[in-house]
Amino acid sequence: MTPSSPPPPAFYYLTNFERALAWLGERYDDVFDDRERAFLQAFPSLPQASRALLVRMLMRNGPDFRASKLAYDEIGCPLAAAAPLVAAGWVDPAPVLTLDEIFALCTKAELLRMFAALGAHAGERKSEWLDRLRLEHDMAQPFDVWFSGAGQPGAGQPEAGHPGAGRDDHVLRVTVGALCDRLRLMFFGNLHQDWSEFVLADLGVFQYESVPFAPSSRAFQRRGDVDAYLALHACRDALDAWPDDAPLEALVDAIGTVACGQPWLETRRAKLLFAVGQAGERRGAWPLALDAYARSAWPGSRHRRIRVLERSGRDDDALALALDARAAFESDEERQRVERMLPRLQRRAGRAVERAAAAPDVPRDTLVLARPDTFVSVEYAVRDHLAQPGAPVHYVENTLINSLFGLLCWEPVFAAVPGAFFHPFQRGPADLHAPDFAARRADAFAACFAQLDSGAYRETIRRHYATKLGLQSPFVFWGVLSPELLDEALACLPPAHLRLWFARLLADIRSNRSGLPDLVRFWPAERRYELIEVKGPGDRLQDNQTRWLGYCIGHGMPVRVVDVEWAGDVVVPAAAAGHCA
């Protein structure tokens, strides 16, 4: 929300939640079980304060909440609001709490009074108390019993008048958390977003493309798809909590047994197996890492297998796999990594070392500039220095090529492919970085690329610029793409070059949407351009920048690197500086 935006309505979060429930109810009734269906039917009939309280608790870390911490002006008394939730069976008004749970709910001062008779003292941290008390205190009891000291001879009593202390406070436990997490997953398509991130579209802060949701485009086609996602998510959580000294083979097997009936779920499995492989590498568990990577189709898995084979001393196997990769690289990133490894692998395997193909010679000039009196980025300094009447220079970095691609290919990017769109407030498809993103939309992308041959691309880009202006997009940078920049780009960038850029971008969106040169200079009268990568003193080209520069040079595109030095810092031959006019 911008500073000038009005504050949201008092119950904005409840409106969001109810919209999500209505959205799900219209599209997934056949996927719900009886309990979920009953929840969706009963929720609207509860008093507004009760509905709001439940959503507030779902938006916070739970499932246990002290009533004194649920103070919301629009809700009023939390206990009164909770009564209908208790009657519905969605909230437990007197949960039995373990030692760990009571520690999570209470302050250090409260715990000190509660466990004074057991030797707790102020000099210890809460975590130290908890570790020690676990060894001698395994009971579970309601909150008021913990606070009264029952069962703890000599335990301290709460101070009189202490707000929310002891029996004056209550704990409420949400018992429909798992059910609502399942609904949250079905709406957002993931479990890292929560209801607090759900922004009302009609606040005008963000606007989204309208994506048609046909039954065939649903991400979850059957209940088992939701179960599969949750099973993979549980495996991911297990990996994060897995003890360092425990073998990971059982987790790999568990991931393999999940029944993934959708391609996008298989992609999630592949990504998870890749993460397990990385964990195996960190532990030096080479066989486990190899197995996980071999089962994974996630980009980079083959390169990691080569690394593991090398690190485990299997030099011949590492070389053989690297040569297989060289025969058909999966991406430019893999090509760059494997070509760096091959000479070393050949030496280690006792083979003749093949000379790597020479990298394209990228034109490189040095420009000496007076150091600005106030801070100006080196890219802007070069832009201002090079700009001339009839030859404007723009700082665009990754924004221009991405934006032109996004405008030309708007329809395939926002195609309602299963697993791509879950709700009406998405910036882009959820599978944007999946290895099969382009393949699942191949015909639509081919139709867009064909416009580069027919000349229709200019009209399509201009039409989308006019009709989609301001809509969220993973590619289009509306704040950078001015009408003037768009006109100059369409006049000066050849469609053959656009096709090459777009094809490379689409081949590996995760890696190739960044690394493009900083500046573009146009000569509109001559309908030509050049791309310029700017490097300040001490800056080096990054791998993705090197790949883009090599690609452009290899296809005959006008591109160069300009190294900037500040006058007075170093002495640069005049001839070297003279190329930047």
What are these regions (language model features)?
Residues T2-A52, R56-V276, G280, R348-L493, ...:
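N-terminal alpha-helical interaction modules that lie
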